[in-house]
Amino acid sequence: MANVKLFDQTGKEVSSVELNEAIFGIEPNESVVFDVVISQRASLRQGTHAVKNRSAVSGGGRKPWRQKGTGRARQGSIRSPQWRGGGVVFGPTPRSYGYKLPQKVRRLALKSVYSAKVAEDKFVAVENLSFAAPKTAEFASVLSALSIDSKVLVILEEGNEFAALSARNLPNVTVATATTASVLDIVNADKLLVTKEAISTIEGVLA
């Protein structure tokens, strides 16, 4: 079992927390992480690109001139692709770029990125993040007390709405729950700030 320091909201070290080696202490598999990041980035693409082919372009229903006798090349429509203002051949159409990888691969990628953050000492465990009301300034003071001044992913337990609302308006702060934190979120963050309850949930999901 790997141990990490456990802090309270004031930045004081209160104890330590044991992490499951099978989740937070494995050798990171970079190729699997790469595959999952590419998959998740592909799923974020809108895919709303579209062009008009010759059947969608307005006009062009009449043959521009007769078939024979003019000396010019035969033409059937002024919306053929070779005409200015004509349709596009084999242009992009709306589509989804998303694709799914096997669950085993996704789980291994999550374990890999969590393990990498722990190994790099970029995993900050906090006893809890409790707020009486949504207060951005209070959350900012928590980050300051924990010496977090770079891009951070805050991983909360389910239902901690006040903490989520307090953090969401801060620059360089991303909020997720233990079940929704993605490989892409973790890779993009310089540090992870994880509550003790969220750690238990992560271990329960990935064990």
UniProtKB/Swiss-Prot annotation:
InterPro entries: Ribosomal_uL4, Ribosomal_uL4-like, Ribosomal_uL4_dom_sf. Signal peptide: none annotated. Residues 49-78 are annotated as: Disordered. SUPFAM superfamilies: Ribosomal protein L4 (SSF52166). GO terms for biological process: translation. GO terms for molecular function: rRNA binding; structural constituent of ribosome. One of its GO terms (cellular component) is ribosome. It holds the Pfam family Ribosomal_L4. Gene3D superfamilies: 3.40.1370.10. Keywords: Ribonucleoprotein, Ribosomal protein, RNA-binding, rRNA-binding. Belongs to the universal ribosomal protein uL4 family. Part of the 50S ribosomal subunit. HAMAP family: Ribosomal_uL4_B. One of the primary rRNA binding proteins, this protein initially binds near the 5'-end of the 23S rRNA. It is important during the early stages of 50S assembly. It makes multiple contacts with different domains of the 23S rRNA in the assembled 50S subunit and ribosome. This is Large ribosomal subunit protein uL4. The gene is rplD.
